Amino acid sequence: MTGELPRGRRWSARTTWASRLNVPLRAFLHTETGSARVLLAAAVVALAWANLDESSYESLWGNTLSVQLGGWQLSHDLRYWVNSGLMTFFFLVIGLEVRRDFDLGELRERRRLTLPLLAGIGGILVPIAIYLAFNAGRPTAVGWGVVMATDTALALGMLAVLGPRFSDRLRNFLLTVAVVDDLIVIAVLAIAYPEHPSPTALFVAAGIFALVLLIRAAGGRWGPGYLLLGVAAWLAVSESGVDPVVVGLVMGLLTYAYAPARTELQRAADRFRLFREQPSPQLARSVRAGLSAALSPNDRLQHIYHPWASYLIVPLFALANVGVVVDGELLARAATSPVTLGVLFAYVVGKPAGIVIASMLVARLSHNRFRAPVGWAAIIGVGTVSGIGFTIALLIATHALHGPALDEAKIGILVATVGASLTTWLVFRLAARLPPARRARALLGVSEGIIDLMVPVDPDRDHVRGPREAPVTVVEYGDFECPYCGQAEPAVRELLTDFTNIRYVWRHLPLTDVHPYAQVAAEAAEAAGDQGAFWEMHDLLLAHQGELRPADLLGYAERLDLDLDRFREHLADRRGAVRIAEDVDGADLSSVSGTPTFFVNGRRHHGSYNIEALSAAVTSAFAGTRLRPRDDREPDRRREVGSEQPDEEPGT
């Protein structure tokens, strides 16, 4: 390669686009990783508080909080307001994430829902059978719903800590299975454990949801209106005797998601430019409206509610419900209690068994038409970590059991959480001991993902660096004036050095509304390409992003010993404009709005653009091709999935 990049440049591991607009799943997982620690700390505090001063603990959560309007009054204790009020927002976040996966993620191809759906059902039926085997014929058999759920937040957090790095497919699979559990649990909570059911109130709630659908179909986008309807639905469901947390899940599932359109982003940029020239309250409102319109309601609501749900609501729920006096009598009773043993074995043994057996049967009976997006070691790991029922299990337990049986169930849930975490650590520890190629296959599998790149790579048309017939292709949509493309360039160079059997493709996406010289720089690259020097010009342009005026471009052409008259003529006639416009159209088809955007074997790469993240994506792609990622040397173990090496810090 020609052209040198400035040395010593520090760069963020994530572009502004990635950190602000896209990759909700990665942001979701990052939040859950941190919130898992807060949740566990809250559980420890609750246990300590209850054992040091049980009376103050119960007294606080037993206080009554009432809402009264005229002759109407809603009165419940604080624990109810946490369990059925604030937890509604937690289930709203879960519903939002499911809907996003349906609209933009793996589940937009509906057949991919089959295996995780059946795996989730298997992970419910086997634990129920184990619990009932311990409690058959006893009054505590009514607590069978306790062992159904997976605590999505804590399970994702534990997987981030205990599982392999850079495996979004693994986390996606866990999220889908866990959400299937949660959906069924919410239905069971509404049907099997209602309190004083009121059909009239349920009909009112159904009418409100129907109104939400009508407004949504008509294109209504007024957020406060949806909020008022959500509150009304919550009150109606609460009066019906059904746990109103179901409202959050339903409202989340009804909130559509879509990728930001480049036209909307350009419109927002135009409005901001007008505001910059003539600041006024009217234009300020216009700018806010434009920015809001560029993002889907799903993205906006996740941004608002997810941190609150993760760092406040779920820990507060644990604080209100985990507190149980652990004394010798309770431990002795729990050691032989059918409730405790049923919960423990259902989660630690039943969950992984149900998920693994169901996945195996679906794959075998469908002749691998329905195959998990991950390998079998990862499926086992998802099964074991799904045994963390914690938050949702406690929620069901408070509805299904009372008195000593409830305390025994809480002990079982706590012990099962520890047991499931330990078995998950063991599974991935054993997987890490496999040889690199087998480890990648065991964790990542060989299932093909959805192709996000709508315009396939054409070696006769595209600008290709590397072997034309390489098994793995990395495509970048870039802008020569975009500073983040310049910051990602060293990682791309290192990637091509580390992996000799990949091809790299550059496609143009000049963001002309914010980068005034991006278009002419792209045309200069095409003019150089007309003389066989596209990549040399590409390297120079990214190395000198602040110097892209026409005179600078002519200087680069002269440095590359190009025919200057031919170069000038190419630029003057704008011969490269059509080619660039075709790349931009392809970007629109693939829902690409920002730069840099990478695709690895047709799948969009989300998140960081440092060498570690890109190498992991390439390694994952090679696992699907059954070929070696490097054809001339042993694999670099630092880059392998499951490596014990620490992550590279952003900016290093």
Swiss-Prot record:
Lineage: superkingdom = Bacteria
Q: Which organism is it from?
A: Salinispora arenicola (strain CNS-205)
Q: Name the chemical reaction catalysed here.
A: Na(+)(in) + 2 H(+)(out) = Na(+)(out) + 2 H(+)(in)
Q: What is this protein called?
A: Na(+)/H(+) antiporter NhaA 1
Could you tell me which residues belong to the region Disordered? 626-652
The membrane spanning regions, by residue number, are 27-47, 78-98, 114-134, 142-162, 173-193, 200-220, 227-247, 312-332, 343-363, 376-396, 411-431
**Bilayer topology term:** Multi-pass membrane protein
Q: What does this protein do?
A: Na(+)/H(+) antiporter that extrudes sodium in exchange for external protons.
User: Is this entry keyworded Lipid metabolism?
Assistant: no
Q: What is the lineage of its organism?
A: Bacteria, Bacillati, Actinomycetota, Actinomycetes, Micromonosporales
